[in-house]
Amino acid sequence: MTTGTVDGICYEVHGWPVAGREVVLLSSGLGGSAAFWAPQMKALTERWPVVTYDHRGTGRSVRALPPGPYSVDDMAQDMVKVMDALGLTKAHVVGHAAGGNAGLALALNHPDRLGKLVVVNGWSRPDPHIQRCFDTRIHLLNDTGIKAYVHAQPIFLYPADWISRNHARLMAEEAHHVAGFPPREVMLARINALLAFDIDARLEEIPHRVLVSASADDMLVPMSCSQRLAARLPNADFQQVAWGGHGFTVTDPETFNEGLIKFLEGA
C-alpha cells in the first residue's frame, strides 16, 4: 500500500504501479472515511489497483473546508486532485451516497476523467424524505451533540435485525467514531451540500456506463431515487437488493460485490 496527501486530502493506493492500468477509485458517503470500503477491498484488489481517500474535512484529511459555500462539485474536484496526484488520466469511480453523487458531478464537470461509475444509494434531486432524515440529524448534532448523533447513526444506516445482531460491534465502534468525528461545522456543510445537490435536469448529459445500486429497505434514501437515476441515465444498469439498508455494502457485501465486479469487468 502506498499513501500520500494532496491539498490536504489523505489517500491510499492498494496495488502499485497504477500507470497504464484500469484503476478503481472509491468515494465514501457522508462520514467520508475510506475505511467504509473495507468489505470491498479484497474482491477489488484481486483485480485492479484501488485508490481510497478520506474526504476533505474528515478522517486523516485536513479537518476543515475552504471558506465559502461547499458543494458536491467541490467533492468531485477533490477526486480530480487525487487522480492528478497519481498521474491518472481517468478512473472507474464507486461512490456511496455522497460519494456517488460526487461521481455524478464528476461525470458532468470532468467527463474525460471518468471511466465507469457505480452510484450506491444516491440521488439526483432534493427529496422530502432525505430532507427529513438530514433535518433530524442536524437537530441531533446541534441540540444534543456528537455522542447522540453517532449513537443514532445506525438507525439511518442499517436494518433493525442487523443492528440487533451486531449490537456489541456497534457499541465497540461508537467511541472510535465519536473520537474521529469531523468538526461540527464540517459535517453541517457536508449535509447542506447534499441537500442542495440537484442535477436532475442534466442526467441525459451523462453518457458513461453507470451501475445504479440500491437497497429496497434503505431508510435514508428512498429506492425510488435510484430507480429515477437508472431510468433517466442513458447508459445505466440497475442493481436492486431486497435487504441491507442504506449501508448494504457493509451488511451484505457478498451480494453487492458480486454485482460490482460483474459490472466493472463487463464491456
From Swiss-Prot:
Tagged with keyword Hydrolase: yes
EC number from the UniProt entry: 3.5.1.-
Keyword tags: Hydrolase
SUPFAM superfamilies: alpha/beta-Hydrolases
Family recorded in the similarity comment: Belongs to the AB hydrolase superfamily. Hydrolase RutD family.
Keyword Hydrolase: yes
Catalytic activity annotation: carbamate + 2 H(+) = NH4(+) + CO2
InterPro entries associated with the record: AB_hydrolase (IPR050471), AB_hydrolase_1 (IPR000073), AB_hydrolase_fold (IPR029058), Pyrimidine_utilisation_RutD (IPR019913)
The protein's name in its UniProt record: Putative carbamate hydrolase RutD
First-tier enzyme category under EC: hydrolase
PANTHER family in alphabetical order: AB HYDROLASE-1 DOMAIN-CONTAINING PROTEIN, HYDROLASE, ALPHA/BETA FOLD FAMILY PROTEIN
Taxonomic placement: Bacteria, Pseudomonadati, Pseudomonadota, Alphaproteobacteria, Caulobacterales
Residue stretches making up the AB hydrolase-1 domain: 23-139
Pfam families reported for this sequence: Abhydrolase_1 (PF00561)
Coiled coil: none
Gene Ontology biological process terms from the UniProt entry: nitrogen utilization; uracil catabolic process
Molecular functions per Gene Ontology: hydrolase activity, acting on carbon-nitrogen (but not peptide) bonds, in linear amides
Originating organism: Caulobacter segnis (strain ATCC 21756 / DSM 7131 / JCM 7823 / NBRC 15250 / LMG 17158 / TK0059)
